[in-house]
Regions:
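Acidic/histidine-rich
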Residues: 84-118, 387-413, 444-445, 451-453, ...
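Conserved phosphate/anionic-ligand binding catalytic regions in large, soluble enzymes, centered on
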Residues: 30-34, 103-112, 181-185, 229-235, ...
């Protein structure tokens, strides 16, 4: 079990598992026990001593307390579960039943791995994929008891057995390994040509059903948090550009404060894991108000995939690195296709234009593969040269704004370097005051054919250079054109405006990765971050 600190610092004393006072119970836990303080106070009054600052330790002492009353581990476990509030995935072992593991969940992922003579508990399929491809996914308010050769799932309220379907895991352990790459992040960046192809080969009928939801809704919203919020912001731009529809993008953690939910609303979310707490909570609230819900997720059988009315399984394969790359780019491609389909349905574009756009998307994997093969070395050298830079501004206009945001986030997450993504127009409203020798800028320049955005972006660059600021320009113009405006430039092959921002995102990913390796960061497991954020 790997603990992600929510209550108490990262210390040995706060490390799982926690044992009861009599050492007959040991517990590990994901989530947050929201009422642990009054429970802890009551236990302390009864003479229980606590050695940590965590909420989890309460569980071990409660188990000891209730076992002494009933002399039955299962009854003690159920009684404990009835008292605690919040979110949890809990696993328990007891000296009274050394051949069994007890587990339960509420709003935190938990699944069983079912082998012939071995059983597993995990919060993700990858925990046991080397041993079995058969899984049972627990739902909220269920608990399970497993042993080497048997398992049983029960309803928490009635304690009656529940028959659960077996879920077949579609990938194998080899796809979850590094395959010769130094880090999962680099491997997953290099897998993006394939994940884009997978996204473009999704079943048309499933996409069309979601397009119908967009077409029928009176108000549609795009949800995500962190990287997927920037995916949603990207979607906002492509739906506006292609389908001439404005769908607000909302960060899932701000959903309650912003969204106007009713039965005519549609809430479409993106989530790599399908377990993101903030997004899951937002969708549950939307459904409680009668709204339609849909999602693009990467993990089959995940909580979001099972909750929403319509789901797209993006088929990107397991993403192991905490930093999302291939899943995010795939989701952007899927949102682009959905926007194109809605545009045709509304007659905002012709079928001919749709086919031209689809051809551009089909060419994207080959173009990205070429960039990975031919430009990675240059990007590596560039990142290493400027790895000492402590402050970056990432600038983009229009659809390049979410690309700037996501690229800056990658720099923060993996390299621990301060980076801000912002629209180019922000410069003259305050940010120009920051331009000096300690602040450098990366600018995502659109193709010249995208005339208005291109000219506005070049004006932003001129504003920075007029103040002697450093500019790394990532652009599609020929060698030598406007080169005097760039301190450094990275020239990309000419592509249509539709796919240009997607290509630039790959550059942002690589630049962050190579900066992180130059700084000797823990690339696949950055400090203080978790792959699937299942707590509030």
């Amino acid at each position: 079990h790997t603990r992600w600190a929510t209550h108490g610092k990262v210390t040995k004393e706060n490390t799982h598992p926690f044992t009861s006072r009599d050492d007959n119970f040991a517990v590990v836990h994901n989530g947050i026990i929201s009422n642990y303080r009054p429970l802890k106070a009551q236990l302390q009054k009864e003479g229980f001593k606590f050695s940590s600052e965590t909420d989890t330790e309460v569980l071990a002492h409660l188990l000891e307390k209730f076992y002494k009353r009933s002399r039955n581990v299962e009854n003690a476990f159920v009684k404990m579960l009835s008292l605690i509030e919040g979110t949890y995935a809990i696993a328990l072992i007891s000296s009274y039943h050394p051949e069994q593991i007890f587990c339960a969940k509420k709003e935190s992922p938990l699944m069983l791995g079912i082998g012939d003579e071995i059983k597993f508990i995990g919060s993700d399929f990858n925990a046991f994929i080397d041993h079995t491809k058969n899984a049972v996914i627990l739902d909220d308010r269920e608990y399970a008891i497993i042993s080497r050769d048997a398992y049983v799932v029960k309803d928490l309220l009635s304690k009656e057995e529940i028959t659960k379907p077996i879920t077949k895991i579609e990938w194998d352990s080899e796809t979850s390994k590094k395959g010769g790459y130094p880090h999962y992040m680099l491997k997953e960046i290099y897998e993006q040509p394939q994940t884009i192809s997978n996204a473009l080969d999704l079943e048309e009928s499933g996409l069309d059903e979601i397009v119908d939801l967009f077409a029928k809704s009176k108000s549609s919203y795009l949800l995500g948090v962190g990287t997927t919020f920037y995916v949603a912001k990207y979607g906002k731009y492509v739906f506006s550009k292609l389908a001439q529809e404005f769908f607000p993008s909302i960060s899932s953690d701000e959903f309650m404060a912003l969204a106007n939910v009713n039965k005519q609303s549609l809430f479409f979310c993106a989530s790599q894991s399908g377990e993101t707490f903030d997004t899951l909570s937002a969708l549950k609230h939307a459904k409680s108000k009668g709204a339609q819900t849909a999602a693009v997720v990467n993990v089959m059988g995940s909580s979001i995939a099972r909750l929403v009315d319509k789901v797209v399984l993006q088929g990107s394969g397991p993403e192991i690195c905490v930093i999302s790359t291939k899943a995010a780019l795939s989701q952007m491609v899927i949102l682009t296709v959905l926007a194109m389909k809605l545009a045709v349905k509304k007659k905002a574009i012709t079928t001919k234009t749709y086919n031209q756009h689809m051809l551009s998307l089909r060419e994207l994997p080959g173009i990205i593969q070429g960039i990975l093969n031919e430009r990675s070395g240059f990007i590596h050298r560039l990142a290493h040269k400027y790895s000492g830079t402590r402050n970056w501004l990432y600038l983009g206009r229009g659809v390049y704004y979410p690309i700037a945001l996501e690229s800056a986030l990658k720099m923060k997450e993996v390299a621990y370097v301060h980076a801000e993504g912002m629209p180019g127009g922000f410069l003259k409203h305050g940010t120009l005051a920051m331009i000096d020798d300690d602040v450098s800028s990366i600018v995502f320049v659109p193709p010249p054919e995208d005339k208005d955005l291109y000219e506005a972006t070049m004006h932003s660059i001129e504003e920075i250079r007029a103040r002697s600021g450093f500019v790394l320009g990532i652009h599609f113009s020929e060698q030598g054109k406007n080169s005097d405006l760039y301190s450094e430039e990275l020239i990309l092959p000419k592509v249509p405006p539709l796919t240009a921002p997607l290509i630039q995102l790959v550059i942002g990913q690589l630049f962050a990765y190579f900066t992180a390796t130059s700084l000797k960061r823990n690339v696949d497991k950055p400090r203080s971050l978790a792959k699937s954020v299942t707590v509030a």
